[in-house]
Design a protein with these regions (language model features):
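Solvent-exposed N-terminal domain segments of exported/luminal and surface proteins
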Residues: 1-3
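Extended, loop-rich substrate-binding clefts of extracytoplasmic carbohydrate-active enzymes
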Residues: 8-45
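Acidic, contiguous internal or C-terminal segments within carbohydrate-active enzymes
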Residues: 34-73
Length: 114
């Protein structure tokens, strides 16, 4: 989840208000403004993945919180490549027993782990 300001890991505390009136939702594109964090969030699907783009305000306190806190997850921060890689096995059902949801993030600014 894209957040700004004080880094917050609690889901309830980092939640953001948004308006359905400001959403754009089509089968090939989704866009929403997260008001609490002043972040524009966009996503578009591919055949087997989704691409996200977060547009943050210009400040020194912008983050992407990756929820990978259970025993079925793996996260690796590669600061020299501005990249985060990993996977989670969390799901809502309807997937094979060995399911893993892999992710790769690439930042065009510097990255660091917290």
């Amino acid at each position: 989840m894209p957040v700004t300001g004080k880094l917050e890991f609690d889901e309830e505390k980092r939640a953001s208000w948004f308006s359905h009136k400001g959403e754009i939702a089509t089968p090939s594109y989704y866009k929403v403004y997260l008001a609490e964090h002043d972040v524009v969030t966009e996503m578009t699907p591919t055949e087997r993945a989704v691409l996200f783009r977060f547009t943050f305000p210009e400040n020194e306190h912008s983050y992407i919180v990756v929820d990978a806190f259970d025993k079925g997850s793996y996260v690796k921060v590669i600061p020299e490549e501005n990249k985060i890689i990993g996977y989670t096995t969390r799901n809502s059902g309807g997937v094979p027993k060995n399911f893993k949801n892999y992710f790769v993030t690439v930042s065009y600014t510097h990255l660091r782990a917290h």
